């Protein structure tokens, strides 16, 4: 390994860090040798109503997968994120909200946030929402979205946040799956100067007869735009708050009671409702937030994710607020009104820690130094990356141009299902290698296995698995425990299968190589190929579709679709555009195909399985690396696809 690619821990970071290398090694060792003792001690960072006596009861045996942490303890998540901070830091800023328009921002103290959460919790109770009921939150990035999440947690309701970029059809599917009782939305969202019709999307979603579980729609006024109103069903958020009491006792919740459901893409098409519970999740989010970001009281922390994704749940809301941090909530996008927006926000709010995605970094990098022109940036102390592996080139640009070579980068690897960061450098303990997620967090035991499930030792490449449970782990898929077991524990028995491939180097550092299943990673967001294929095939002119990921300069992975049309249908540029718009409507803009190639037939095995491996190679013009195609039902299809791809590339 060349010395140039290693960035040792900076002495000034090591001097002030919460976790230096010796501490990391000692704590990690204890966490894997004596998990009960380690997590019993760490759990003291939470305020318990009834202390737990048992720490860890977990089994990865695929006949009885069962995950419980601190099972007999009770507590309340909202109390841990709000009430317990009031005496010491009630007047500390909890949330800095930065609007889409740079002229708009708000600062909300812990005391103010606590009051609004209590009022809205009472308002929800007034709408017959109680412990165990599911509430769908389909909101822009405004403080009321965080209020809604914490209000649910306060009364023991389960929230299901759906990203505001999802279509009415996708929203309806996520409402139906969890029999949601109430939907909370806004009249419109604002993002990059454009309005999104959130309330209209909810109205459309609720025309689906299977969404009849929804009794009320609570609407927050964001733009004041024209919306349709159903006076039997719709209620204004502000009207509810005006009459609500600001006193609301937090509900005593069991450690293993449900906190939230978050839908993530699966390889079979139907989105999976990942279920997280109360104590283990909160403890893990708080501990990882403190240690990975080396968070110190009074610092300004900005995670650029959307609350509709797990990163927003764990590292905008629950982790930072449990730690009494100041968390920045940004409504807009990194390039609006122009590409300097991120640096301007950093300077305006004196941001110390920036946690963003490689997609945003690549978008800024594409503009050279323009994105940091006129910026000071001296408040920054630490940079983070999340959502997909960051390529070394983007890492170097982020380190040199945004961090001015003064800020360590924590390149974090984790998933919706893991609740929090599993593999990441700790800034005061880990020498950095651009592109590597480096070492496991406390209590996390990663391993590599071959395709037969045999453990591979030393420097090697293989399937990434985790050998034992950690408190932030998802407990099940909502209403479908069999699918949970099949997806994560059947492939490699007795292990949690991440769906990712990884390489381990001679220093024991992990390098994530990408998905090994049929899931794409577009701009840091997971999307199942089956979900896009299903949407495409639902179009009346399409007979069959196959989706593969291809490298994309900005998004990381682009969406490449092979389409077979029904007999009698003619391919055309107009139809290409129509199909793109169709997928946008079915799933959302995020799933819009980057490339559509017409395919008279697809390469299939004799059993009818589409050979995606071949399609991936053709899409990236690796025509000589197709491997053995003699087993295909019709090998002639391949040459035709290659010719079409060549003519597309030439055009």
UniProtKB/Swiss-Prot annotation:
EC number of this enzyme: 6.2.1.1
Cellular component GO terms, alphabetical: cytosol
Residues annotated to bind CoA: 191-194, 311, 335, 523, 584
Keyword Acetylation attributed: yes
Binding of Mg(2+), residues: 537, 539, 542
Cofactor: Mg(2+)
Keywords of this entry: Acetylation, ATP-binding, Ligase, Magnesium, Metal-binding, Nucleotide-binding
Catalytic activity: acetate + ATP + CoA = acetyl-CoA + AMP + diphosphate
Family: Belongs to the ATP-dependent AMP-binding enzyme family.
Full protein name: Acetyl-coenzyme A synthetase
Gene name of the record: acsA
């Amino acid at each position: 390994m060349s010395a140039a690619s290693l960035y040792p821990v900076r002495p000034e970071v090591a001097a002030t860090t919460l976790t230096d290398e010796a501490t990391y090694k000692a704590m990690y060792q204890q966490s894997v040798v004596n998990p009960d003792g380690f997590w019993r001690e760490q759990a003291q960072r939470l305020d318990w109503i009834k202390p737990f006596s048992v720490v860890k009861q977990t089994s990865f045996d695929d006949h009885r997968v069962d995950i419980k942490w601190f099972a007999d303890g009770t507590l309340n998540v909202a109390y841990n994120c709000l009430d317990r901070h009031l005496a010491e830091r009630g007047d500390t800023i909890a949330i800095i909200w930065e609007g889409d328009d740079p002229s708009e921002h708000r600062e909300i103290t812990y005391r103010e946030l606590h009051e609004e959460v209590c009022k809205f919790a009472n308002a929800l109770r007034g709408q017959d929402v109680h412990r165990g009921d599911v509430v769908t939150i389909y909101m822009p990035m405004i403080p009321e979205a965080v209020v809604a999440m914490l209000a649910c947690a306060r009364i023991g309701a389960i929230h299901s946040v759906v990203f505001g970029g999802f279509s009415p059809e996708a929203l309806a599917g996520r409402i139906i799956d969890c029999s949601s009782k109430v939907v909370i939305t806004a009249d419109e969202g604002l993002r990059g100067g454009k309005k999104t019709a959130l309330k209209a999307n909810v109205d459309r979603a609720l025309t689906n007869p299977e969404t009849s579980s929804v009794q009320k729609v609570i609407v927050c006024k964001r733009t004041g735009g024209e919306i349709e109103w159903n006076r039997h069903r719709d209620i204004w958020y502000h009207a509810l708050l005006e009459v609500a009491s600001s006193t609301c006792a937090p509900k005593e919740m069991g450690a293993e009671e449900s906190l939230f459901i978050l839908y993530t893409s699966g390889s079979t098409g139907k989105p999976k409702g990942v279920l997280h519970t109360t104590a283990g999740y909160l403890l893990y989010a708080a501990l990882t937030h403190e240690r990975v970001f080396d968070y110190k009281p009074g610092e300004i922390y900005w995670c650029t994710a959307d609350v509709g994704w797990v990163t927003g749940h764990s590292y905008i809301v629950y982790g930072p607020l449990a730690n009494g941090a100041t968390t920045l909530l940004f409504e807009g996008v990194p390039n609006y009104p122009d590409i300097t927006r991120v640096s301007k926000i950093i300077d305006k709010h004196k941001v110390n820690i920036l946690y963003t995605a490689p997609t945003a970094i690549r978008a800024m990098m594409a503009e050279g130094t323009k994105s940091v022109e006129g910026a000071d940036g001296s408040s920054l102390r630490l940079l983070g990356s999340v959502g997909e592996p960051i390529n070394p080139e983007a890492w170097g640009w982020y380190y040199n141009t945004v961090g001015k070579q003064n800020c360590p980068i924590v390149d974090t690897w984790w998933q919706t299902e893991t609740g929090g960061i599993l593999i990441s450098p700790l800034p005061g303990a880990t020498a950095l290698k651009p592109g590597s997620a480096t070492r496991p967090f406390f209590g996390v035991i990663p391993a590599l296995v071959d395709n037969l499930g045999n453990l591979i030792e030393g420097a090697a490449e293989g399937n990434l698995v985790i050998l034992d449970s950690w408190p932030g782990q998802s407990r099940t898929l909502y209403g479908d425990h069999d699918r949970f077991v099949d997806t994560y524990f059947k492939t490699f028995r007795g292990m949690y299968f991440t769906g990712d491939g990884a390489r381990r180097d001679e220093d024991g550092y992990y390098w994530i190589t990408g998905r090994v299943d049929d899931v794409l990673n577009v701009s840091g967001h997971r999307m199942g190929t089956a979900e896009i294929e299903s949407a495409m095939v639902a179009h009346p002119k399409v007979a069959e579709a196959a989706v593969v990921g291809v490298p994309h300069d900005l998004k990381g992975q682009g969406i490449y679709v092979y389409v077979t049309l029904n007999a009698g249908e003619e391919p055309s540029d107009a139809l290409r555009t129509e199909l793109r718009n169709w997928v946008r409507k079915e799933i959302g803009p995020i799933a819009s195909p980057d490339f559509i190639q017409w395919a008279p037939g697809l390469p299939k095995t004799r059993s009818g399985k589409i050979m995606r491996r071949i399609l991936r190679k053709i899409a990236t013009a690796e025509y000589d690396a197709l491997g053995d195609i003699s087993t295909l039902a019709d090998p002639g299809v391949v040459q035709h696809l290659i010719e079409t791809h060549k003519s597309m590339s030439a055009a």
